[in-house]
Protein backbone atom coordinates (compact mmCIF):
# COMPACT_ATOMS: atom_id res chain seq x y z
CA UNK A 1 0.00 0.00 0.00
CA UNK A 2 2.94 2.33 0.66
CA UNK A 3 4.33 1.70 -2.83
CA UNK A 4 0.99 2.49 -4.45
CA UNK A 5 0.70 5.71 -2.49
CA UNK A 6 4.14 6.89 -3.70
CA UNK A 7 3.33 6.08 -7.33
CA UNK A 8 0.09 8.04 -7.14
CA UNK A 9 1.88 11.05 -5.69
CA UNK A 10 4.53 11.21 -8.38
CA UNK A 11 1.98 10.95 -11.18
CA UNK A 12 -0.14 13.62 -9.55
CA UNK A 13 2.82 15.98 -9.35
CA UNK A 14 3.78 15.51 -13.03
CA UNK A 15 0.17 15.97 -14.13
CA UNK A 16 -0.22 19.22 -12.21
CA UNK A 17 2.77 20.83 -13.92
CA UNK A 18 1.86 20.05 -17.55
CA UNK A 19 -1.87 19.17 -17.81
CA UNK A 20 -5.14 21.04 -17.25
CA UNK A 21 -7.25 20.19 -14.26
CA UNK A 22 -9.78 18.13 -16.30
CA UNK A 23 -7.02 15.88 -17.60
CA UNK A 24 -5.57 15.54 -14.13
CA UNK A 25 -8.95 14.46 -12.77
CA UNK A 26 -9.28 11.85 -15.53
CA UNK A 27 -5.78 10.58 -14.78
CA UNK A 28 -6.53 10.44 -11.08
CA UNK A 29 -9.69 8.45 -11.78
CA UNK A 30 -7.91 5.99 -14.02
CA UNK A 31 -5.07 5.62 -11.54
CA UNK A 32 -7.52 5.06 -8.70
CA UNK A 33 -9.36 2.38 -10.68
CA UNK A 34 -6.08 0.70 -11.53
CA UNK A 35 -5.00 0.75 -7.89
CA UNK A 36 -8.35 -0.64 -6.78
CA UNK A 37 -8.11 -3.41 -9.33
CA UNK A 38 -4.55 -4.17 -8.27
CA UNK A 39 -5.53 -4.26 -4.61
CA UNK A 40 -8.40 -6.62 -5.36
CA UNK A 41 -6.05 -8.92 -7.30
CA UNK A 42 -3.61 -9.00 -4.39
CA UNK A 43 -6.46 -9.78 -1.94
CA UNK A 44 -7.68 -12.64 -4.13
CA UNK A 45 -4.14 -13.95 -4.49
CA UNK A 46 -3.49 -13.65 -0.76
CA UNK A 47 -6.77 -15.31 0.22
CA UNK A 48 -6.11 -18.22 -2.14
CA UNK A 49 -2.97 -19.06 -0.14
CA UNK A 50 -4.59 -18.86 3.33
CA UNK A 51 -4.35 -21.97 5.49
CA UNK A 52 -7.75 -23.15 6.87
CA UNK A 53 -8.19 -22.23 10.54
CA UNK A 54 -8.10 -25.03 13.08
CA UNK A 55 -11.21 -25.42 15.26
CA UNK A 56 -10.98 -24.18 18.87
CA UNK A 57 -10.56 -26.92 21.48
CA UNK A 58 -13.63 -27.52 23.65
CA UNK A 59 -11.64 -26.58 26.77
CA UNK A 60 -11.04 -23.10 25.34
CA UNK A 61 -14.69 -22.69 24.34
CA UNK A 62 -15.72 -23.52 27.90
CA UNK A 63 -13.62 -20.61 29.20
CA UNK A 64 -15.81 -18.11 27.36
CA UNK A 65 -19.18 -19.79 27.66
CA UNK A 66 -21.92 -17.64 29.17
CA UNK A 67 -21.95 -18.10 32.94
CA UNK A 68 -25.75 -17.87 32.94
CA UNK A 69 -26.16 -20.72 30.45
CA UNK A 70 -29.31 -22.69 31.14
CA UNK A 71 -28.93 -26.18 32.57
CA UNK A 72 -31.50 -28.94 32.92
CA UNK A 73 -31.50 -31.04 36.07
CA UNK A 74 -31.74 -34.71 35.04
CA UNK A 75 -32.86 -36.49 38.20
CA UNK A 76 -32.57 -39.91 36.57
CA UNK A 77 -28.79 -39.43 36.41
CA UNK A 78 -28.48 -39.27 40.20
CA UNK A 79 -31.06 -41.59 41.71
CA UNK A 80 -34.07 -39.33 41.27
CA UNK A 81 -32.64 -36.53 43.42
CA UNK A 82 -33.58 -32.95 42.54
CA UNK A 83 -31.46 -29.90 43.24
CA UNK A 84 -32.65 -27.49 45.93
CA UNK A 85 -31.60 -24.58 43.70
CA UNK A 86 -31.11 -24.02 39.99
CA UNK A 87 -27.68 -24.84 38.65
CA UNK A 88 -25.79 -21.97 37.05
CA UNK A 89 -22.22 -21.86 35.84
CA UNK A 90 -20.08 -20.11 38.41
CA UNK A 91 -22.36 -21.19 41.29
CA UNK A 92 -20.87 -23.75 43.68
CA UNK A 93 -22.94 -25.82 46.12
CA UNK A 94 -21.14 -25.51 49.46
CA UNK A 95 -21.45 -26.97 52.95
CA UNK A 96 -19.31 -27.42 56.09
CA UNK A 97 -19.05 -30.79 57.82
CA UNK A 98 -17.11 -33.38 59.79
CA UNK A 99 -16.37 -36.60 57.88
CA UNK A 100 -17.19 -39.96 59.46
CA UNK A 101 -14.97 -42.90 58.58
CA UNK A 102 -17.13 -45.95 59.33
CA UNK A 103 -15.76 -49.06 60.99
CA UNK A 104 -16.63 -52.54 59.78
CA UNK A 105 -19.21 -53.11 62.53
CA UNK A 106 -21.07 -49.97 61.47
CA UNK A 107 -21.33 -51.15 57.86
CA UNK A 108 -22.60 -54.56 58.95
CA UNK A 109 -25.40 -53.02 61.00
CA UNK A 110 -26.22 -50.58 58.20
CA UNK A 111 -26.60 -53.39 55.66
CA UNK A 112 -29.07 -55.15 57.98
CA UNK A 113 -31.06 -51.92 58.33
CA UNK A 114 -31.25 -51.45 54.56
CA UNK A 115 -32.58 -54.99 54.14
CA UNK A 116 -35.18 -54.44 56.88
CA UNK A 117 -36.40 -51.20 55.25
CA UNK A 118 -36.59 -52.93 51.87
CA UNK A 119 -38.83 -55.59 53.41
CA UNK A 120 -41.28 -52.78 54.23
CA UNK A 121 -41.10 -51.55 50.63
CA UNK A 122 -39.01 -48.52 51.59
CA UNK A 123 -35.96 -48.60 49.29
CA UNK A 124 -33.25 -46.65 51.12
CA UNK A 125 -30.01 -45.72 49.37
CA UNK A 126 -26.85 -45.71 51.48
CA UNK A 127 -25.13 -42.30 51.52
CA UNK A 128 -22.12 -42.02 49.23
CA UNK A 129 -20.13 -40.52 52.10
CA UNK A 130 -20.93 -40.32 55.79
CA UNK A 131 -20.68 -36.93 57.44
CA UNK A 132 -22.07 -34.63 60.11
CA UNK A 133 -23.19 -31.26 58.73
CA UNK A 134 -22.48 -27.96 60.48
CA UNK A 135 -24.13 -25.77 57.85
CA UNK A 136 -26.92 -25.75 55.33
CA UNK A 137 -25.99 -26.25 51.69
CA UNK A 138 -25.52 -22.76 50.25
CA UNK A 139 -24.47 -21.32 46.90
CA UNK A 140 -21.07 -19.65 46.55
CA UNK A 141 -19.97 -17.64 43.54
CA UNK A 142 -16.60 -18.82 42.31
CA UNK A 143 -14.79 -15.62 43.28
CA UNK A 144 -16.12 -15.92 46.85
CA UNK A 145 -14.50 -19.29 47.52
CA UNK A 146 -11.07 -18.15 48.69
CA UNK A 147 -12.27 -15.36 51.03
CA UNK A 148 -15.00 -17.66 52.37
CA UNK A 149 -12.50 -20.42 53.16
CA UNK A 150 -10.04 -17.95 54.66
CA UNK A 151 -12.74 -16.54 56.94
CA UNK A 152 -13.52 -19.99 58.35
CA UNK A 153 -9.84 -20.86 58.70
CA UNK A 154 -9.14 -17.68 60.67
CA UNK A 155 -12.13 -18.25 62.96
CA UNK A 156 -10.97 -21.77 63.87
CA UNK A 157 -7.42 -20.82 64.83
CA UNK A 158 -7.78 -21.72 68.52
CA UNK A 159 -10.56 -24.30 68.41
CA UNK A 160 -9.65 -27.59 70.10
CA UNK A 161 -10.40 -31.01 68.61
CA UNK A 162 -12.92 -33.26 70.37
CA UNK A 163 -15.07 -36.32 69.74
CA UNK A 164 -18.79 -37.00 69.60
CA UNK A 165 -20.95 -40.11 69.75
CA UNK A 166 -24.12 -40.88 67.80
CA UNK A 167 -26.55 -43.61 68.74
CA UNK A 168 -30.26 -42.93 68.29
CA UNK A 169 -31.88 -43.17 64.84
CA UNK A 170 -33.95 -40.24 63.64
CA UNK A 171 -35.80 -39.38 60.42
CA UNK A 172 -35.25 -36.07 58.61
CA UNK A 173 -36.39 -34.43 55.38
CA UNK A 174 -35.04 -31.51 53.38
CA UNK A 175 -36.88 -28.18 53.27
CA UNK A 176 -38.38 -28.91 49.84
CA UNK A 177 -39.69 -32.34 50.99
CA UNK A 178 -38.04 -33.95 47.98
CA UNK A 179 -35.87 -36.33 50.01
CA UNK A 180 -36.12 -38.21 53.30
CA UNK A 181 -33.05 -39.12 55.34
CA UNK A 182 -32.25 -41.71 57.98
CA UNK A 183 -29.72 -40.32 60.42
CA UNK A 184 -28.01 -41.23 63.68
CA UNK A 185 -28.36 -38.36 66.16
CA UNK A 186 -25.43 -37.18 68.26
CA UNK A 187 -25.75 -37.83 71.99
CA UNK A 188 -22.28 -36.75 73.16
CA UNK A 189 -20.39 -33.64 72.00
CA UNK A 190 -23.37 -31.42 71.20
CA UNK A 191 -22.06 -28.28 73.03
CA UNK A 192 -18.88 -28.29 70.92
CA UNK A 193 -20.90 -28.72 67.74
CA UNK A 194 -23.17 -25.82 68.68
CA UNK A 195 -20.18 -23.57 69.25
CA UNK A 196 -18.66 -24.55 65.92
CA UNK A 197 -21.91 -24.03 64.02
CA UNK A 198 -22.12 -20.49 65.41
CA UNK A 199 -18.59 -19.81 64.19
CA UNK A 200 -19.53 -21.05 60.72
CA UNK A 201 -22.71 -18.94 60.86
CA UNK A 202 -20.62 -15.79 61.30
CA UNK A 203 -18.88 -16.50 58.01
CA UNK A 204 -22.23 -17.18 56.36
CA UNK A 205 -23.47 -13.78 57.51
CA UNK A 206 -20.41 -12.08 55.97
CA UNK A 207 -21.52 -13.38 52.57
CA UNK A 208 -25.28 -12.94 53.14
CA UNK A 209 -25.84 -16.71 53.10
CA UNK A 210 -28.30 -18.83 55.07
CA UNK A 211 -27.22 -19.72 58.61
CA UNK A 212 -27.75 -23.09 60.29
CA UNK A 213 -30.97 -24.16 61.99
CA UNK A 214 -31.93 -22.39 65.22
CA UNK A 215 -32.34 -25.66 67.10
CA UNK A 216 -30.14 -28.09 65.15
CA UNK A 217 -30.26 -31.86 65.50
CA UNK A 218 -26.68 -32.89 64.77
CA UNK A 219 -26.56 -36.29 63.11
CA UNK A 220 -24.64 -38.58 60.80
CA UNK A 221 -26.58 -39.11 57.57
CA UNK A 222 -26.84 -42.84 56.85
CA UNK A 223 -29.26 -43.28 53.95
CA UNK A 224 -31.97 -41.52 51.95
CA UNK A 225 -34.95 -42.05 49.67
CA UNK A 226 -36.83 -39.86 47.20
CA UNK A 227 -39.89 -37.90 48.32
CA UNK A 228 -41.35 -37.15 51.73
CA UNK A 229 -41.40 -40.58 53.40
CA UNK A 230 -40.95 -39.23 56.93
CA UNK A 231 -44.13 -40.52 58.56
CA UNK A 232 -44.09 -43.78 56.65
CA UNK A 233 -40.53 -44.56 57.69
CA UNK A 234 -41.26 -43.68 61.31
CA UNK A 235 -44.38 -45.86 61.52
CA UNK A 236 -43.26 -48.79 59.40
CA UNK A 237 -39.81 -49.67 60.61
CA UNK A 238 -37.92 -47.06 62.64
CA UNK A 239 -38.25 -49.05 65.88
CA UNK A 240 -37.18 -52.19 64.07
CA UNK A 241 -34.10 -50.46 62.68
CA UNK A 242 -33.21 -49.10 66.12
CA UNK A 243 -33.58 -52.64 67.46
CA UNK A 244 -30.86 -53.82 65.07
CA UNK A 245 -28.50 -51.22 66.57
CA UNK A 246 -29.42 -52.15 70.14
CA UNK A 247 -29.03 -55.89 69.46
CA UNK A 248 -25.49 -55.64 68.09
CA UNK A 249 -23.43 -58.64 69.23
CA UNK A 250 -20.94 -56.44 71.10
CA UNK A 251 -23.68 -54.40 72.74
CA UNK A 252 -25.64 -51.38 71.44
CA UNK A 253 -23.66 -49.84 68.59
CA UNK A 254 -22.39 -46.29 69.05
CA UNK A 255 -20.84 -44.38 66.15
CA UNK A 256 -17.81 -42.49 67.44
CA UNK A 257 -16.70 -39.53 65.37
CA UNK A 258 -13.26 -37.99 65.95
CA UNK A 259 -13.69 -34.28 65.28
CA UNK A 260 -10.10 -33.34 64.57
CA UNK A 261 -10.55 -31.63 61.20
CA UNK A 262 -13.46 -29.62 59.87
CA UNK A 263 -14.03 -29.65 56.12
CA UNK A 264 -15.72 -27.44 53.57
CA UNK A 265 -16.86 -28.90 50.27
CA UNK A 266 -17.59 -26.46 47.47
CA UNK A 267 -18.32 -27.97 44.08
CA UNK A 268 -15.66 -30.63 43.57
CA UNK A 269 -13.15 -29.01 45.92
CA UNK A 270 -12.65 -29.95 49.58
CA UNK A 271 -10.86 -27.65 52.04
CA UNK A 272 -9.54 -29.04 55.33
CA UNK A 273 -9.29 -27.11 58.62
CA UNK A 274 -7.27 -29.05 61.24
CA UNK A 275 -8.31 -28.33 64.83
CA UNK A 276 -5.77 -27.84 67.62
Curated annotation (Swiss-Prot):
Under catalytic activity, the entry for this protein gives: a 3'-end uridylyl-uridine-RNA = a 3'-end 2',3'-cyclophospho-uridine-RNA + uridine; a 3'-end uridylyl-adenosine-RNA = a 3'-end 2',3'-cyclophospho-uridine-RNA + adenosine
* Subcellular localization: Nucleus
Q: Where is the active site?
A: 131, 219
Query: Which GO MF terms does the UniProt record name?
Result: 3'-5'-RNA exonuclease activity; lyase activity; poly(U)-specific exoribonuclease activity, producing 3' uridine cyclic phosphate ends
UniProt xrefs under InterPro entries: Usb1 (IPR027521)
The EC code for this enzyme is 4.6.1.-
Gene3D superfamilies according to UniProt: Cyclic phosphodiesterase
Q: Which family does the record assign?
A: Belongs to the 2H phosphoesterase superfamily. USB1 family.
Q: What does this protein do?
A: 3'-5' RNA exonuclease that trims the 3' end of oligo(U) and oligo(A) tracts of the pre-U6 small nuclear RNA (snRNA) molecule, leading to the formation of a mature U6 snRNA 3' end-terminated with a 2',3'-cyclic phosphate. Participates in the U6 snRNA 3' end processing that prevents U6 snRNA degradation. In addition also removes uridines from the 3' end of U6atac snRNA and possibly the vault RNA VTRNA1-1.
Protein name (record): U6 snRNA phosphodiesterase 1
- Organism name: Danio rerio (Zebrafish)
Q: Gene encoding it?
A: usb1
Amino acid sequence: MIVNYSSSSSEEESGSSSSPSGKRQKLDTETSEALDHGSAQRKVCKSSHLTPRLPLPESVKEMFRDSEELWTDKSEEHGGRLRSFQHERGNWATYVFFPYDPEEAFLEVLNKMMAAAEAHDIPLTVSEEFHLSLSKTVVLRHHWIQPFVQSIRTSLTHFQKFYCVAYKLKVYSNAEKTRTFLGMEVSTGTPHLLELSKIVDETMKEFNLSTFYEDPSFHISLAWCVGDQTERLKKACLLELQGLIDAHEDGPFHARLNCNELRCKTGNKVFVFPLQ
